[in-house]
């Protein structure tokens, strides 16, 4: 579903532009991944530098209305819904959405 994939890309890029550290490079990559038996899927990754990673469980970033402490300023706005929509779309299409972070770098990975 092209519209759903476009919405995922838009939401992830919106999230990255809101919360990336100043002068951060936002990277988007898309690659084909073999799932065996002639089946394939796509892996979309959006990553960027952040001033600080949210403390605790990064996976909570996908919870509806959850906002990490570092993102509560009025400068960034947002309602805490976008990433939960990303995960819902991915799962509705038989995929997944995950997040990883290390050394002021955060990456969101969506597999379809």
List PLM regions with ranges.
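Short helix-loop "hinge" at the ATP-lid/N-box region of the Bergerat-fold HATPase_c
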Residues: 16-17
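Short conserved segment of the HATPase_c
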Residues: 53-67
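Conserved glycine-rich
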Residues: 94-95
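Glycine-rich nucleotide-binding loop
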Residues: 41, 52, 80, 102-109
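A residue-level detector for a conserved hydrophobic packing site
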Residues: 5-6
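Short alpha-helical Gxxx[C/S/T] motif in the catalytic ATP-binding
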Residues: 82, 86
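Short beta-strand/loop element within the Bergerat-fold HATPase_c
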Residues: 23-40
């Amino acid at each position: 579903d092209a519209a759903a994939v476009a919405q995922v890309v838009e939401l992830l890029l919106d999230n990255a532009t809101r919360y990336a550290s100043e002068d951060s490079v936002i990277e988007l990559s898309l690659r084909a991944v073999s799932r065996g038996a002639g089946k394939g899927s796509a892996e979309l990754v959006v990553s960027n530098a952040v001033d600080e990673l949210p403390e605790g469980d990064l996976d909570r970033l996908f919870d509806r209305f959850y906002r990490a402490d570092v993102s509560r300023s009025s400068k960034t706005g947002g309602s805490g819904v976008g990433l939960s929509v990303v995960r819902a779309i991915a799962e509705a299409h038989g995929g997944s959405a995950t997040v990883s972070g290390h050394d002021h770098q955060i990456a969101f990975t969506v597999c379809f």
